[in-house]
């Protein structure tokens, strides 16, 4: 049986904007309360109706297809907004009309009765969320891992499954409408320009991220990068105890090459990352706060060390694809902003970089230092090619390719023994691909075709 939620009951007219992954989860959740349901979606009527029948069966759901209108949505008492919806003017108008506007985190907040770990940042949040989940499971805890990755939080609430800890990846889009969401442990990994097409500028993007801390109390824990000036700014923080992690001497969770350490229960604990998938600069910075979180939730040090040793990285994040004639090929398709690309380049020495795609408003001049220090050839693809060329052509040799296949072929022709060919786009994928996973899979196929040709 669903826990009572002050935002929804049988007398509520509950609307959902956008029937994507989060919207479907919201509909499944709302069906359990017997509310009057409205759905507004951009897809055509036939496709939307098929989705509603599949999800709601015989339950009557009023809907509008082909867009979102004030006239339809203003009937609602409460509106659930999917993270991808960006019409702030419409939402403001609905609020003025007395409609409550909520995101997933705000809707779930009143009924969360287990410790919640919420992880955000421009880069690394998926890896760290997965790692925290693995470390907690290694200690025998029942864990839900989801949010912006995998299973939506509302599906956990619908299921009634009992867990000990909830671990969530949360995005800036979700945090904009977080309401009274208050995680017991909140982690901000890093901040660099991203989604500026949505947030307007870096200040707007940072403000969305800082919602993570605003409702925390004195018994909660806030963990932020001690190396990132944007994370260190205290404005927007709540009342939680704050811990810094990183290479900085001021860090409470101290990171160094191949290991990290922190004080716990009066003892200095040292954790080695040697021979693990996390033994690189990015991995050190990911593992340190993850282990501190697990330790803060009463996991044993030995269990944490076992979880770190067993951890494997997800696809499309600095994923080794092949070694061909002494050249290493890496798929980093998940790198959709400049910060992620810089992090990838810092792990390599002589790089042929494939970058480009759909621009998200990023400043590609931020890549100049890392490109000058690590990249000997840049191959640009996609709509952002002119922007990348303008920002970088005076610090690196630049080529243009009309397809990813052409880019891989060019990279292979330029590469010499000891080089690395890296797909790390700094852009969204939607100009040429279905998503970043599709882009990464196509890159992998092209590279493996090179390997097949070379073996004949």
From Swiss-Prot:
Keywords: ATP-binding, Cell cycle, Cell division, Cell shape, Cell wall biogenesis/degradation, Cytoplasm, Ligase, Nucleotide-binding, Peptidoglycan synthesis. ATP binds at residues 121-127. Its EC number is 6.3.2.9. One of its GO terms (biological process) is cell division. It is found in: Cytoplasm. One of its GO terms (cellular component) is cytoplasm. InterPro entries: Mur-like_cat_sf, Mur_ligase_C, Mur_ligase_C_dom_sf, Mur_ligase_cen, MurD. Pfam families: Mur_ligase_C, Mur_ligase_M, MurD-like_N. Pathway: Cell wall biogenesis; peptidoglycan biosynthesis. It catalyses: UDP-N-acetyl-alpha-D-muramoyl-L-alanine + D-glutamate + ATP = UDP-N-acetyl-alpha-D-muramoyl-L-alanyl-D-glutamate + ADP + phosphate + H(+). It comes from the Bacteria. GO terms for molecular function: ATP binding; UDP-N-acetylmuramoylalanine-D-glutamate ligase activity. Cell wall formation. Catalyzes the addition of glutamate to the nucleotide precursor UDP-N-acetylmuramoyl-L-alanine (UMA). NCBIfam families: murD. PANTHER family: UDP-N-ACETYLMURAMOYLALANINE--D-GLUTAMATE LIGASE. Belongs to the MurCDEF family. HAMAP family: MurD. This is UDP-N-acetylmuramoylalanine--D-glutamate ligase. It comes from Desulfotalea psychrophila (strain LSv54 / DSM 12343).
